[in-house]
A protein has these predicted regions:
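Hydrophobic alpha-helical transmembrane segments
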Residues: 1-67, 159, 165, 172, ...
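Internal alpha-helical transmembrane segments of multi-pass membrane proteins
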Residues: 170-180
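Pore-lining and gate-forming transmembrane alpha-helices of multi-pass membrane transport proteins
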Residues: 51, 141, 145-149, 179, ...
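Secretory targeting signals
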Residues: 33-61, 94-165
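Alpha-helical transmembrane segments of multi-pass membrane proteins
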Residues: 11-15, 89-110, 181-185
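C-terminal TM-helix exit segments that contain a strictly Trp-centered aromatic cap at the helix terminus
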Residues: 109-119, 186-198
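Helix-loop-helix units of permease transmembrane domains in multi-pass membrane transporters
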Residues: 69-100
Length: 250
């Protein structure tokens, strides 16, 4: 049943994924046509392709997290109600895995397209093989970082959607207050988890240089933060499944 639900969700959203992939490719081609000549500009271009692409993907993650369950619930059709499993494990897990598949495809597209300027620099001998490999490591890490961030945002907002459905709150201001309280408690939970992973290095992963320039991500995210975010995501998924089973009524 989970496999059927995943395929159903992917079919309904594959057009969105294709549109995003097309936008990312168009942005890449347009940027290259702008005739960036120096190495630093091409290096920055690769970073910008990754950054702006994932801004779109992160926005999509928030939208999907907010609307995934509510949209299904609002359909209220006999066909959907008959096909809907009452088990929260199937609903929550299938939604997450479907989005995981979509964002993985987008991440691969972003990683591939953002390497185009690097290949251009290598072909034109603007950089050597060693610097090319260094740049590839940096771009790949940044893409992987945003991939994890997109998944985390989806999980965060999906759990909030389950929370709202379980509490049956329809007042906008009540939901807004609930949202900010939820984010505050989540930040406190992550802070606790960071202490749990205190044995990990308290420093950002090492980023290599591109064209002689060193790039960092959002001030640098250390290993403790990455581990704490991953554990918090698991907690939210499990809590969402339990809450869905006990409180959400279809």
């Amino acid at each position: 049943m989970i496999a059927k639900l995943i395929w159903k969700d992917i079919r309904e959203n594959f057009i969105n994924t294709l549109i995003f992939a097309g936008l990312i490719l168009a942005m890449t081609i347009y940027s290259l046509v702008k005739n960036f000549k120096d190495v630093r500009s091409l290096a920055v271009l690769s970073i910008l392709i990754v950054a702006f692409s994932f801004i779109m993907v992160l926005g999509y993650a928030i939208y999907r997290g907010f609307s995934s369950l509510k949209r299904e619930k609002d359909r209220n059709t006999l066909e959907f109600l008959l096909s809907l499993p009452v088990d929260g494990l199937e609903i929550v897990t299938s939604k997450f895995l479907a989005f995981f598949t979509e964002v993985l495809l987008l991440s691969l597209c972003i990683a591939l397209f953002s390497h185009i300027p690097l290949f251009y620099m290598l072909i034109t001998k603007a950089i050597g093989k060693a610097e090319f490999i260094s740049a590839v490591k940096t771009i790949t890490y940044i893409a992987f970082y945003f991939f994890l961030l997109a998944l985390f945002l989806f999980i965060v907002f999906q759990f909030y959607e389950i929370l709202v459905l379980s509490l049956k709150t329809k007042n906008f201001f009540v939901n807004a207050i609930l949202f900010f309280v939820y984010l505050y408690l989540l930040s406190e939970l992550i802070a606790i988890f960071k202490k749990v992973f205190g044995f990990l290095p308290d420093q950002p992963p090492i980023l290599h240089t591109i064209g002689g320039e060193t790039f960092t991500i959002m001030g640098g995210t250390n290993y403790q933060g990455l581990a704490a975010g991953a554990l918090a995501g698991v907690v939210l998924i499990v809590s969402g499944i339990i809450l869905f089973n006990k409180k959400v009524e279809v």
